[in-house]
A protein has these predicted regions:
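Class II aminoacyl-tRNA synthetase catalytic cores and aaRS-like
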Residues: 1-326
Length: 326
């Protein structure tokens, strides 16, 4: 009886993996186009560790322990150290790990593309996003034309591509919250309410928008971004397509003392929440205090963007071995 059950399981696994073969071919092309774009832009591809001693402390992201280290939720700190060391334009495609419930939009292990431009502004990153998406749509469409694909609705994809107007619309956080949440998060410091309304009011509205950049996040949502001159809003943006967050970009904070203070506050919140505790990365902070050039950086979810551009319902559909399925 156990043997029969095992055989049934094997057949089911094979069937699922066979159905993902065409999507895997598209994913290969998709990743190649990312690399091709950055190479043409003069970027250097880098690799940084998956296990580190001191991640950037963020109170809304939990990490996985790995002996006396932690699996990275982002390669951000290590990539910024490279910028401080004189690297000018760098990118990385890597696996990241976050301890969160798996869903159609979340996996505990996922693929991220992160890139940094010295002497650049967030507007340069927005142009990168638009140019990359244009290239990806072109390559996906070419693949559609030359191949029979049964797991993807080509008509739905083509409809989405026609709706994507370049350059993408930009919407200030202050305005969209006033219109759809009924309050001004720039004047009222309420991060919990901000997060709840983002999920329940703002993102549902954004499903009506093909693509949009949300800009001008409140200072308490600055994370590792610098503030605008008004000190109330951050030089930060997020890219949404069909109401799904795809990328998060910053004009990077280059004041080491301010960054250290932010880390201390985040660590205190993490402790209150009972989250993993770790020391501040002193090497990062001390180097930042010595100096870092004006830099903009961004993290983009590879799995999410591919899922959205293929009009699939879950990132599980673009990952061969998603958590919770194998």
């Amino acid at each position: 009886m156990k043997s029969d059950n095992h055989e049934i399981l094997v057949e089911k696994d094979r069937f699922i993996l066979q159905r993902k073969m065409e999507v895997s071919k598209i994913r290969m092309i998709f990743l190649n186009e990312f690399r091709s774009y950055f190479m043409k832009e003069g970027f250097l591809e880098v690799e940084t560790p998956l296990r580190i001693l001191s991640p950037a402390p963020e109170s809304n992201i939990e990490t996985f322990k790995s002996e006396d280290h932690f699996l990275i939720a982002s390669p951000e700190l290590q990539m910024k150290l490279l910028i401080m060391a004189g690297y000018e334009k760098i990118f990385q495609i890597t696996h990241c790990f976050r301890k969160e419930k798996c869903s159609d939009l979340h996996q505990t292990e996922f693929t991220m593309c992160e890139w940094y431009r010295k002497d650049a502004k967030i507007e340069d990153l927005m142009k990168d996003c638009e140019n990359i998406i244009k290239k990806e749509i072109s390559e996906i469409s070419t693949f559609f034309d030359g191949n029979k694909i049964y797991e993807i609705n080509k008509d739905l994809c083509n409809s989405l591509y026609k709706k994507l107007n370049f350059p993408f619309e930009k919407i200030e956080i202050e305005e969209i919250y006033k219109d759809f949440a009924g309050w001004n998060p720039i004047e009222i410091n309420d991060p919990i309410r901000f997060d709840i309304d983002m999920v329940t009011k703002i993102e549902p509205y954004l499903k009506n928008k093909a693509a949009v950049f949300l800009v001008g996040y409140p200072y308490y949502q600055a994370s590792l971004a610098r503030l605008r001159d008004n000190k109330k809003t951050a030089q930060r943006f997020e890219l949404y397509i069909n109401g799904i967050e795809i990328a998060n970009g910053f004009d990077e904070l280059i004041d080491g003392y301010e960054q250290e203070n932010r880390f201390i506050k985040e660590l205190a919140i993490r402790k209150e929440k009972g989250m993993n505790e770790y020391a501040i990365d002193k090497r990062f902070i001390e180097n930042l205090k010595i100096g870092m050039p004006q830099t903009s950086g961004i993290a983009l979810g590879i799995d999410r963007l591919l899922m959205v551009l293929l009009c699939l319902k879950s990132i599980k559909d673009v990952i061969l071995f998603p958590q919770g399925s194998f």
